[in-house]
Amino acid sequence: MGLESIGSNIRKFRLMKKIRQEDLAEKAGLSTNYVGAIERGEKVPSLEALIDIVNALGISADMVLCDVVHTGYEVRHSLLA
């Protein structure tokens, strides 16, 4: 999975916590359009926005980044081999 999984993971946790997209955006201090674009995989959040989102959701960043970090780890080790 690539960077688009960040948005789908954010959406998954938002829905699990029964938070509306508008409420997440407000809590994170972001626009609803920006959060929607992130969730659809159209935009990759900045580090600051990602921190604001995970704090607003009450989750850790690794829960959102698990697919991306795992892929990067495999690529790094294959390049070093």
Task: Give a label for each model feature.
Residues 65-81:
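Short, charged recognition helix plus adjacent turn
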Residues 48-63:
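DNA major-groove recognition helix of helix-turn-helix/homeodomain DNA-binding modules
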Residues 10, 21, 32, 47-50:
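Helix-turn-helix DNA-binding elements, focusing on the entry/boundary residues of the two helices
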Residues 1-5, 73-76:
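A detector for short, charged/polar N-terminal pre-domain segments
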Residues 10, 24-25, 35-38, 64:
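Conserved hydrophobic/aromatic packing and binding residues within compact polymer-binding modules
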Residues 8-25, 79:
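Short basic helix-loop element that most often maps to the first helix and adjoining turn
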